[in-house]
UniProtKB/Swiss-Prot annotation:
The gene is miaA. ATP binds at residues 11-18. This is tRNA dimethylallyltransferase. It comes from the Bacteria. One of its GO terms (biological process) is tRNA modification. It is an enzyme of class 2 (transferase). Residues 35-38 are annotated as: Interaction with substrate tRNA. Monomer. Catalyzes the transfer of a dimethylallyl group onto the adenine at position 37 in tRNAs that read codons beginning with uridine, leading to the formation of N6-(dimethylallyl)adenosine (i(6)A).
């Protein structure tokens, strides 16, 4: 039965994931957000949070609930997802995971990775390295000890950079070598991938950035700075936010410089997402507009 399964819908940034949700019947499904930045309060525009009209149309979970200074990890997400799926199924609805954080989707499908515990002594050591020598030193260290992990990570994701080094310093084994996983708690999964041509994506990314600016992104950034959020705030690791930190370290950067960098980073991120998702097995690929009827018939 369709009600017994779980649905994944993923694709690169700006592919049009949110738009298709307006066509989903609210009485048959609920959405579980799979985005590591949209979870944060106050970081609204550059994170492309679902708008009020979409949230009203169909219920969303794991959006706009976490304080910006809090870390959000795979482990927290996985535990929350388990609980929410049970709640949705009790309502006789279909749980639909929607987003672009590929790392989360991978472990929803394959199971939560088993990595060793790290002592407080090791954590303090890595934090001291960061304070004394900076992020660039940690990245250099990670590239030396675990190039596989280095190539996988967002270079602004300081939490996972530190975590990777902590595991290595604790065990002498790169975190990428810890392949043992529990069996996934999620069964009977339908995986829907959304795709467009890369040229189309680049155009849509540029349009989206202009829409963000017109929606007040600059005011939002200034407001976040005025509240004391900075480079140590986990929410600021997201594209569209992290670039504005350059205004503090490189005040000669113009707004156009920042916007160009956001565009460049967004395009590179979309490319990484496409590469990652293309390697996932059992994916049914669709164009979000041309194949909309096929998507709806498949899910519902």
């Amino acid at each position: 039965m369709k009600e017994d399964r779980i649905v994944f819908i993923f694709g690169p940034t700006a592919v049009g994931k949110s738009n298709i949700l307006f066509h989903f019947p609210r009485n048959k499904a609920e959405i579980i957000n799979v985005d590591s930045i949209q979870v944060y309060k106050e970081f609204n525009i550059a994170s492309s949070k679902p708008g009020k009209s979409l949230m009203k149309h169909i219920k969303h979970h794991l959006v706009d609930f976490l304080e910006p200074e809090k870390e959000y990890t795979l482990g927290i997400f996985y535990e929350q997802a388990l609980k929410i799926v049970k709640e949705i199924r009790q309502k006789k609805k279909i749980p639909i995971f929607v987003g672009g954080t590929a790392f989360y989707f991978k472990h929803l499908k394959d199971g939560f990775p088993s990595t060793p515990l790290v002592t407080s002594k090791i954590r303090i050591y890595v934090n001291n390295l960061l304070d004394l020598k900076g992020k660039s030193h940690l990245l250099k260290e990670l590239k030396n000890v675990d190039p596989i992990r280095f190539n996988m990570l967002n270079k602004n994701d300081i939490y996972r950079i530190k975590r990777s080094l902590e595991v290595y310093y604790q065990t002498g084994i790169p975190i990428s070598q810890f392949q043992k996983k529990q069996n996934s708690e999620f069964k009977n999964i339908l995986i829907v991938g959304l795709k467009r041509s890369f040229e189309d994506l680049k155009t849509r990314i540029s349009i989206r950035i202009n829409e963000m600016l017109n929606s007040g992104l600059l005011s939002e950034i200034k407001g976040l700075f005025s509240k004391g959020y900075n480079e140590n705030t986990p929410a600021f690791k997201g594209i569209g936010y992290n670039e504005f930190l350059l205004w503090k370290s490189r005040p000669w950067y113009s707004l156009n410089d920042i916007i160009s960098l956001i565009n460049k980073n967004s395009v590179l991120y979309a490319k990484r997402q496409m590469t990652f998702f293309a390697k996932m097995p059992d994916v049914l690929w669709f164009h979000p507009e041309d194949d909309l009827d096929d998507i709806l018939n498949l899910i519902f």
